Every structure is written in structure tokens, then in C-alpha cells.
């Protein structure tokens, strides 16, 4: 149950250096919003996603169990984890979380809840959007488990993780994602 998960709760913040120019960070880097007004000029960083509406967290995990929650304002987002080596400068879908073999994601949209890894999609049953998503990473067990509002288990990935994992969010137009501090 939820009580069990809170033992592993961690605090996350978005890394502004990684944030695509369409994304604006606020609330001490705990909220990322996709501005419909267009991209802002941002200083070039090697770690920035140049063409992909994506941002990573500062925090990363190489071991242990970690639980975090995020609030997604409306459908059109992919939330997951990635290795640091995810491509960041290309155009097209290859840089998106879940669209390469370096990352895993859950797609929230208006039609169908989906899980993605290596660009392969698994359609999931149930509502296609949840405004609050919980994620439990158990590094040694090789599992990433998603929970929807009210702690419904939505999906679990099973994989032998080999590198540090960074929480990652791809954010569609007009959507904001907030990392819950409690």
C-alpha cells in the first residue's frame, strides 16, 4: 500500500540545463510547464534537449529503492527514467523518453495509456490519464512500477539496469508537470 511506498520517498528537482527552450521551470525547479507562447532563448548546454520537449531531474539513482510522485496538469506527457547517455541534440522521436533502448516511459494522453521502451509500445487498460502519478524504482530488482491516482498499479517494467537512472519528463503543449515534495 501507499504507506509502504512513503518509506522510499525522495525529493526531486528538474535540472534547468537539460530543459528544452519551450519548457519554463518554476517553484524552485519543481514545476516544468510547456509554454504555448513559443521557445525562450536559452544558453546552449551539452546536456540540453535542443529539439525535444523534455527535461531531466538533477537526482539520479544507481542503487536502492526510490519513490516519487508527480502531478500532470492534463493529458499529453511521457514520464519515465533514462540513462544519462540518451541522445539530446537530434530531431525526431529518438530523443524522447521511452523511444530508445536507454529509457522507459509511461504515456499519458486522451486516448490510450501506453508503456514505452526502445520505441516499442504496450497499450495498457484503464483510464488514459491520471493527474497524479507515483513511480517506484527498485534498482537491484530491476523494476520500475507506476501508480495512478489512489495508488492503482498501472504498469511495471522489468529490466536489468546497468547505469545511473535519471527521472525524465516529455511535456506536450500547454501541459505542466509538478514534482510533489510530499
Predicted regions and their residues:
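Beta-rich ligand-recognition domains in immune and ubiquitin systems
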Residues: 1-182
Amino acid at each position: 500500500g501507499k504507506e509502504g511506498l512513503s518509506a522510499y520517498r525522495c525529493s526531486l528537482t528538474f535540472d534547468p540545463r537539460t530543459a528544452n527552450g519551450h519548457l519554463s521551470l518554476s517553484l524552485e525547479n519543481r514545476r516544468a510547464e510547456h509554454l504555448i507562447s513559443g521557445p525562450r532563448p536559452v544558453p546552449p548546454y551539452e546536456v540540453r534537449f535542443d529539439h525535444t520537449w523534455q527535461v531531466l531531474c538533477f537526482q539520479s539513482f544507481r542503487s536502492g529503492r526510490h519513490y516519487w510522485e508527480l502531478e500532470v496538469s492534463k493529458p499529453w506527457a511521457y514520464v519515465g527514467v533514462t540513462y544519462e547517455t540518451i541522445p539530446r541534440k537530434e530531431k525526431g522521436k529518438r530523443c524522447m523518453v521511452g523511444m530508445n533502448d536507454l529509457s522507459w516511459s509511461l504515456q499519458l494522453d486522451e486516448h490510450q495509456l501506453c508503456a514505452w521502451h526502445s520505441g516499442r509500445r504496450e497499450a495498457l487498460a484503464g483510464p488514459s490519464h491520471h493527474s497524479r502519478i507515483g513511480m517506484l524504482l527498485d534498482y537491484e530488482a530491476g523494476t520500475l512500477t507506476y501508480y495512478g491516482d489512489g495508488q492503482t498499479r498501472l504498469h511495471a517494467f522489468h529490466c536489468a539496469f546497468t547505469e545511473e537512472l535519471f527521472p525524465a519528463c516529455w511535456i506536450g503543449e500547454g501541459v505542466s508537470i509538478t514534482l510533489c515534495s510530499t
